[in-house]
Amino acid sequence: MSVKTFAAIDVGSFELTMKIFDLSGKNTMREIDCIRQRIDLGSDTYAHGKISNEKIDDLCHTLKEFAQIMESYKVTAYKAYGTSAIRETQNTLILQDQIEQRTGIRVETLSNSEQRFLDYKSIASKGETFRRIIEEKTAILDIGGGS
């Protein structure tokens, strides 16, 4: 079965973002929704070395809502990635286990290099727009939240 609707979830240092895409056109991807929820995971990780139980509860609650939204859109595939706050917390494995058990969503942790690669790849995927901006002197800067 081919993927028709795809969700991408970014568990960032300061915010969770889920984008839903329609992939039904030939070689096209159309964003059909973007949901954001501010949860400051980074403040726990960077100040205390681990994410608090309260923030884990907030995170799981939001991801459950994301799962319901994915169901309403009939999402057939998803990817969920954690970045700096997840990568650098002392309780990464416990956190990932809690998320998967409580929400059914598996969050993979990206290394800093993997995160940057995906960011640049998404910019380059803009096709003609990307080709046009790199014809002149161009700098692409990554100003991330936590990394």
What positions do the PLM features span?
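Primarily the dimerization/phosphotransfer
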Residues: 14
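Nucleotide/phosphate-binding catalytic cleft detector across ATP-hydrolyzing
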Residues: 1-11, 19-143
